[in-house]
Amino acid sequence: MSKIILTGDRPTGRLHLGHYVGSLKRRVELQNSGEFDKIFIMIADAQALTDNADNPEKVRQNIIEVALDYLSCGLNPEKSNIFIQSQIPQLTELTFYYMNLVTVSRLQRNPTVKNEIIMRNFEASIPVGFFTYPISQTADITAFKATTVPVGEDQEPMLEQAREIVRKFNSVYGDTLVEPDILLPDNKACLRLPGTDGKAKMSKSLGNCIYLSDTPEEVKRKVMSMYTDPDHIRIEDPGKIEGNCVFTYLDAFSTPEDFAEFLPDYNNLDELKEHYRRGGLGDVKVKKFLNNVLQKQLEPIRKRRHEYEKDIPGVYEILRKGTAAAYEVAEQTLKEVKAAMKINYFDDAELIKVQSEKYSGISD
């Protein structure tokens, strides 16, 4: 069986460091590993419309932002197939068929759905498209026969429900769909990067993000205003590492080489943490180090983005070609699904032959 990856993002804004450590960086590594036969990267505009139906222009304008972020991070259209979800109509048809295999109560029990409903204040009035997201996500995954889906830990319940739908379909209609495996970030600090304000999640809507396309000045300003330990008032005071955003970001981004380059007084992050805990180390010094670490990571991303920004028609051509290739794959899967469900009437020559013989006998 071919090893195939499917992953993607909603085009509701520019991508940020949470996306980078949660999935983007790993995607590039997987792309360049040579371990996978195909990699599909989806710009999930149709899914974004489930809670932005009254603001399609927001989604429309952010297609290019996400594409630029993808390319600037190192996703290579020669190795990874980047496509736009809404331009693959087979996904909608697959979703429609899968809906018959899922109960409303099962959707209501999905922890990710419940959390997202609360976060978006949908408790009183949930859009059906948003509520059925686990089903449409299953269509996305199975259309491309994905064996591996790299996501953050918050998406685990969604992947488990996708696996349930696949098993249900195969038990009813015969082995047709591929059951995907989840691939979580291997750095535990990357599982969910907090916002710069200390909130549990970096979120575009909360305004607590450091964007991949931020200027050096913007990054520095955001780092220097980061939430730390509110009780660490004086330099000599002992400080807390737990819940301290600056150290969480250092867990995710810093390397021993960074210490040698930017903070040679310490050999590694453990030494820095120990000094902070016992007191005598100020937040400003730690933040300046984090700023240097992030600028080093983001500078090559910024440079690549600026190059792609010079040829926007070329970026759209990358998306057009990727979408055309994705269309062909999804069309083949849809044919297999319809054959398994016995609704491929015009392609079933045997059905037509048998019924022709049946009724020719009656007419005689």
Label each residue range with its predicted role.
Residues 163-364:
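Conserved nucleotide- and phosphate/pyrophosphate-binding catalytic cores
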Residues 23-30, 162-165, 249:
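Buried hydrophobic packing segments
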Residues 2-139, 257, 296-298, 306:
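N-terminal Rossmann-like or analogous alpha/beta NTP/dinucleotide-binding catalytic cores
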Residues 92-96, 133-136, 156-159, 243-247, ...:
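Non-catalytic, well-ordered alpha-helical scaffold segments
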